[in-house]
From Swiss-Prot:
GO-annotated cellular components: EMC complex
Keywords tagged on the record: Glycoprotein, Membrane, Signal, Transmembrane, Transmembrane helix
UniProt cross-references to InterPro entries, sorted A to Z: EMC7 (IPR039163), EMC7_beta_sandwich (IPR019008)
Subcellular location, principal: membrane
Residues that span the membrane, as ranges: 160-180
Signal peptide positions (record): 1-21
Keyword Transmembrane assigned: yes
Highest taxon, organism lineage: Eukaryota
Cytoplasmic topology ranges: 181-216
Native species: Dictyostelium discoideum
Subcellular location: Membrane
Protein name: ER membrane protein complex subunit 7 homolog
Glycosylation site residues: 86, 123
Keyword Transmembrane included in the entry's annotation: yes
C-alpha cells in the first residue's frame, strides 16, 4: 500500500511540473504589425573626395534656397558622405565650406517628387549624375608664401617711388639753384660790360641835312 501511495504522489508531482513547464514555454501570439517602409522624398546624396589629410567632420555643407535665402547646414561623415531629404520644389545653391580645400559650387533644381537636377554653378548646361561626387579643386594656402627680394618690386612699390623722388629732389635742387645763381652773375657781368663795349666802338661821322642839301 505504501509503495502505491508513493507512486501516485510521484506521478501527480511529475504531472504538475510538466504542466507548469508548458505554461512557461508557451508564449502568447500577438499580431505583428507590418511597418510600411517609406523612402524619403527628394533626397540628395553626395560624397566629398579630397586627399587623405582632409578632415570632413570639420566641413560645413550649406544648401541655400535662392528665393527665400533659407539655409540648411549638414556636417559630412568621416567618409565625406552627406545627404539632404524632403527638399521642397525650388532652386538651391550647394556650397562646401572648408579651411583645407576648395570645392566647386553647384545649383540644385528640385522639379518634383524625386526629380532633382544638379548642375555646376559655372556651367549650367551640363547635368551631373546622382549620387553626386564632389572633388576638391586645390588646397587653400593657410600661410602666405614669402616673396623674394627683387629690384623690380621696389620700382613697383608706390612708397619706394615717392622716397626715390624725394631723394632726387634733395640732390638736384642745390644743383639747380647754383646754376641759376651762376646764370644771374653772368647776366650782371654782361650788363656791366655793355657800356664799355659801346665806348670802344669807333665814332662814325654823322651827315647833317644841310650837308646833304649842299651836295645836291
Amino acid at each position: 500500500m505504501k509503495s502505491n501511495v508513493f507512486i501516485l504522489i510521484f506521478i501527480l508531482f511529475s504531472i504538475i511540473n510538466l504542466s507548469f513547464a508548458n505554461e512557461q514555454t508557451k508564449k502568447p501570439q500577438q499580431p505583428q504589425q507590418q511597418q510600411q517602409t517609406t523612402s524619403p522624398v527628394n533626397k540628395l546624396e553626395a560624397k566629398l573626395f579630397a586627399p587623405n589629410d582632409a578632415k570632413f567632420s570639420s566641413y560645413r555643407v550649406k544648401l541655400r534656397d535662392i528665393n527665400t535665402f533659407n539655409e540648411i547646414v549638414q556636417i559630412p561623415t568621416k567618409d565625406g558622405i552627406f545627404s539632404f531629404v524632403n527638399m521642397s520644389n525650388g532652386l538651391y545653391s550647394l556650397e562646401i565650406e572648408s579651411m583645407q580645400y576648395n570645392f566647386p559650387h553647384f545649383k540644385v533644381d528640385v522639379l518634383g517628387k524625386n526629380k532633382i537636377k544638379v548642375r555646376p554653378a559655372e556651367n549650367e548646361t551640363s547635368i551631373l549624375p546622382l549620387p553626386l561626387q564632389i572633388k576638391a579643386t586645390h588646397r587653400i594656402p593657410f600661410f602666405q608664401q614669402h616673396v623674394p627680394f627683387s629690384i623690380f618690386s621696389l620700382v613697383q612699390n608706390p612708397m619706394a617711388i615717392s622716397v626715390l623722388f624725394t631723394c632726387a629732389l634733395i640732390f638736384l635742387l642745390p644743383k639747380m639753384m647754383s646754376f641759376i645763381e651762376q646764370d644771374e652773375e653772368t647776366k650782371e657781368a654782361l650788363k656791366a660790360s655793355t657800356p664799355a663795349l659801346v665806348q670802344q666802338l669807333p665814332e662814325w661821322p654823322t651827315i647833317t641835312q644841310k650837308q646833304l642839301e649842299n651836295k645836291e
